[in-house]
C-alpha cells in the first residue's frame, strides 16, 4: 500500500448506507405496534366475514312489513357484563325515518328510569301518558332506552347509538348506580373500599 492512494476496501465500507439510531428505533417501534395491529385487524375482518360474534350497537337495523325500523339489541349488555349477568333492554321498534309530525323522546338511565320491576308503569310510560293528555293534538314517541344495572360508562355508548334515530328530546335520569351500581365502589365489580373507623 502506498501513501498517496486510498484503500478501496475501506472506501466501500464507509460509503455503505447506515441507519442512525433514531431510524432504527422508529423501525422497531413501527414493527412492535404495526405488526400486531395488522394481525388483529385481519383476524377481526375474518371473524366479521365468517359471521362470528354478536352486534354491539344498542339499536339494530330491521324492517317491518317493508318499513325500515330500529329494534333493540338484546345482546347489548353482553360486552359489559357477559351473557349470564346482562339485562335486556325494553322492547323497541321505531321507524328509521322519523315522521315529521312526531316528537321523538328518548329516556336514558338506570333501573329507576327503566321502571324496574314493571316498565309498563315506569317513567317513560308515565311521561308518554302525561304528554298525550296535555297535548292531544301532537304525536309523541317515547322510547325507553334505560336499562337496569348500568351506569354512565354504559349510557354513553348507548346514547351515541340512539343519536342515529334522530330524537328530538333526550331525558336523562341517572346517578343512582355510580356508587352502588355494578361498577361502583360499593359492589363486587368495583374496588372495595375499607369501612370507616
Identify the function of each model-found stretch.
Residues 104-107, 141-146, 169-174:
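Structural recognition of the beta-strand scaffold that forms the well-ordered cores
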Residues 1-24:
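N-terminal Lys/Arg-rich, disordered targeting/topogenic segments
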Residues 50-135:
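Membrane/wall-proximal cationic-aromatic binding patches
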Residues 53-60, 153-197:
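Interaction-surface signature
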Residues 122, 126-166:
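A conserved hydrophobic secondary-structure block that centers on an alpha-helix together
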Residues 24, 89, 154-157:
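Short, conserved clusters of charged catalytic residues that mark active-site
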